[in-house]
Amino acid sequence: MTRIESTFEILKAQNKKALIPYVMAGDPNPSNFVGLLHDLVKHGADMIEVGLPFSDPMADGPTVALAGERALAAGTSTRDALKMVAEFRQQDTQTPIILMGYLNPVEIIGYDNFVALCEQSGVDGILMVDLPPAEAGSFTQHLTEHSMNEIFLLSPTTLPERREQVLTHCGGYIYYVSLKGVTGSATLDTDDVATQVQAIKAETDLPVCVGFGIRDAASAKAIGAHADGIIVGSALVQNFADIDGNDATAVAHAQQKIMAKMTELREALDSLSVSSNG
């Protein structure tokens, strides 16, 4: 059982929903990043998605794309991101880390080398936005052999053939994209998300987590009522926009705002388990 799988087992036994923050590796600066990960855990993260900076992030909305630009400007590479995860693992051996990114940097490193580096660093899951599930066979197998899960996206516009492939190859959890667009865009239709999540759950035993468009306690609670977890990115990383990543005071203030948001989201999700037990 992978760390992701065991975490969901524990959450299920506790009747809790997973809170999964997304942050960009090296944003706002590499020296702060490991501390940021630990703070996220202290403020309720059950697992963390770490973005790998890439120069052409086609699925990222402006907020996350700018986070990637800041990380790249600070000199953060995929190998640097893995070193940060390894440093995090020295003090935290429990919280799953999922890398989210694009294939090009992985292909430069080489698939086998990348998997080996991920295992050495303590990575638990991989989500490559531009890797079609039908073409992921050997990569998925290699990850599985090294106790990691490969995670895929499903969205309202996923075609039936691809949906079937995702449900066949996905591990850890299904990442359901709640909006038809890029990250951080549009507004949530919670009734539609509820219907879609129920349909996915009828086809798989994997947990279903919902991302894109969750920004506050109300949306967290509305989605958490139906999903096994929520993924929140833009609402967190937007706090690093327009600050100087080398200004320690500005960075600390931005992190305080992120942790306040984490507390808000955690309390919203936990209120669901209280109400369902009550």
From Swiss-Prot:
MF terms from GO for this chain are: tryptophan synthase activity
What EC number is given for this enzyme? 4.2.1.20
* One Pfam entry name: Trp_syntA
Q: In which pathway does it act?
A: Amino-acid biosynthesis; L-tryptophan biosynthesis; L-tryptophan from chorismate: step 5/5
From which residue to which does the signal peptide run?
none
The reply to whether Transmembrane figures as a keyword in the UniProt entry is no
UniProt keyword terms in alphabetical order: Amino-acid biosynthesis, Aromatic amino acid biosynthesis, Lyase, Tryptophan biosynthesis
Catalytic positions? 49 (proton acceptor), 60 (proton acceptor)
User: What's its catalytic activity?
Assistant: (1S,2R)-1-C-(indol-3-yl)glycerol 3-phosphate + L-serine = D-glyceraldehyde 3-phosphate + L-tryptophan + H2O
Q: Which domain of life is it from?
A: Bacteria
Q: Which GO terms describe its cellular component?
A: cytosol
Describe the task this protein carries out.
The alpha subunit is responsible for the aldol cleavage of indoleglycerol phosphate to indole and glyceraldehyde 3-phosphate.
Q: Which HAMAP family match?
A: Trp_synth_alpha (MF_00131)
Assembly notes? Tetramer of two alpha and two beta chains.
The entry's family comment says:
Belongs to the TrpA family.
Q: Which PANTHER family match?
A: TRYPTOPHAN SYNTHASE ALPHA CHAIN, CHLOROPLASTIC (PTHR43406:SF1), TRYPTOPHAN SYNTHASE, ALPHA CHAIN (PTHR43406)
- The name of this protein is Tryptophan synthase alpha chain
